[in-house]
Amino acid sequence: MAREALYGRMGDLTDSVYAMATLFALDRHGARETLQKAARSSGELLILDRYVASNAAYSAARLGDAGVIEWVRELEFSRLELPVPDLQIFLDTAPEVAAVRAADRASTDASRAKDEYEKDSGLQRRTAEYYSRLAEEEWAGRWIATADGDKIIRAVQEIVGSGSGTEDSRS
């Protein structure tokens, strides 16, 4: 349902930050059992694109209020019992670069049209700022903030090799 709302197919639902955050959380909650099983499996690597931190960053950027960040944490990790990640990766890319990539995807793949959030360059800039803050604060666990693929691979290898997320490879 969140995807439908992002493409304007659910009326004015996108006007409510809390409604959209709840829809995104419920989408993840629908996959909770699968996520929890994968998180408990030894030797398994679970990679998710736009997990809980995305909800926190976008919600804070839309409201202009960091207070919603803890509301998202409570909703998703406590109430909905989603697993906390061992590592969160913020691909620290300039919003302008991300906008060009999104436009390229939209022009070459009809299924990748820009959604309501992607169309708003101010929102994208503010969201990137909140992501940077979340990474700096190590919100909900360990982070690496970089666009360097080698650093990301090393951080993931440390987790997979050790079986835990205790080493510090933040850069």
Where are these regions (language model features)?
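ATP-dependent small-molecule kinase phosphotransfer cores
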Residues: M1-L80
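Short beta->alpha linker loops
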Residues: D27, Y51, T93, A147-K151
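Hydrophobic/aromatic beta-strand patches that form the interior of the parallel beta-sheet core
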Residues: I47, L87-I89, R142-I144
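A glycine- and Lys/Arg-enriched "phosphate-lid" helix/loop adjacent to the NTP-binding pocket
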Residues: N55-E129
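NTP-dependent small-molecule kinase module
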Residues: E96-S171
